[in-house]
UniProtKB/Swiss-Prot annotation:
MF terms in GO: norsolorinic acid ketoreductase activity; oxidoreductase activity
Gene that this sequence comes from: stcE
Entry protein name: Norsolorinic acid ketoreductase stcE
Catalytic EC class: oxidoreductase
Organism placement in taxonomy: Eukaryota, Fungi, Dikarya, Ascomycota, Pezizomycotina
Keyword annotations of the record: NADP, Oxidoreductase, Virulence
């Protein structure tokens, strides 16, 4: 497995900066979020990558706000050890003392088919990447989140995981994806109740124009996904700004207006 840090550039102390961590940061929504956070002043943006060695270079040219910096770390959601290893490296090599925002964004949607013929190994892969990885990420980052003034733990969800409105999408051949996203919703809501100091919630980013979004559009017979990455990022950032423990934490919200997405 590639090392989580090939070289150690000088990174300013995190003590007076806003520190963000985003998984699945090499493309799509993850890259869009990294780009938006990096444009903010006095920020440290940590990009979690499935393969740091081959993917980190593509982020080097992203523009930066005043006194802001980027750190790329190895954070493969298919790995059970990467989250803890990445946090150790962030503390030891980069002097990270807190995390203000952690976004579990990395996901997989593949091996389409109904529950009646779904091989268990396909479900296990989806559960690891879409659900277990979010839990491992929280467990690894919890102490650094607790050191922040107003920490947020955000999981990118999917409305197809709904139970109450399953009838509207029951024929979609996305059993693996939907079930694993449902598990992630439970985990984040559980984290909300167990940690009174933390704002933890799930956000539906919309049907975005990413590689995964394009696949879903084809499955549903649509020409393309309706929501641009820029629109989704802007909405998520707006929801982050207004989020608090009493009104946001523990909920599954829509990126555009913060309304509830059915469980």
């Amino acid at each position: 497995m590639p090392s989580a840090a090939v070289s150690v550039p000088e990174v300013p102390s995190s003590d007076r900066k806003t520190v963000y961590l985003v998984t699945g940061a090499s493309r799509g929504l993850g890259r869009g979020l990294v780009q938006a956070f990096l444009l903010r002043p006095n920020s440290i943006v940590i990009a979690g990558l499935r393969n740091r060695t081959s993917q980190a270079g593509a982020l080097d040219a992203l523009p930066r706000g005043e006194n802001s910096s980027l750190i790329a770390v190895q954070l493969d959601s298919g790995s059970k050890s990467d989250p803890a290893d990445a946090v150790s490296i962030l503390q030891r090599d980069y002097g990270i003392t807190h995390l203000d925002v952690v976004i579990a964004n990395a996901a997989i949607a593949a091996n389409y088919g109904p529950a009646s013929t779904m091989p268990l190994e396909y479900l296990e892969t989806h559960m690891q990447i879409n659900a277990y990885a979010a839990l491992l990420l929280f467990q690894a980052t919890r102490v650094l989140l607790q050191a922040a003034k107003s920490p947020q733990f955000i999981c990118v969800g999917a409305p197809i995981s709904t139970i109450t409105e399953m009838e509207s999408c029951a024929r979609a051949p996305l059993t693996n994806y939907a079930l694993s996203k449902l598990a992630a919703c439970y985990l984040v809501r559980k984290i909300h109740f167990e940690n009174k100091w933390l704002v933890a919630y799930i956000v539906d980013p919309g049907h975005i124009q990413s590689d995964m979004g394009a696949q879903a559009a084809r499955l549903f017979g649509r020409k393309e996904a309706p929501t641009t990455i820029e629109e989704s990022v802007a909405g998520i950032c707006a929801r982050m700004t207004e989020a608090d423990k009493n009104t946001t934490s523990g909920r599954f919200i829509l990126f555009s207006d913060g309304s509830d997405v059915p469980w």
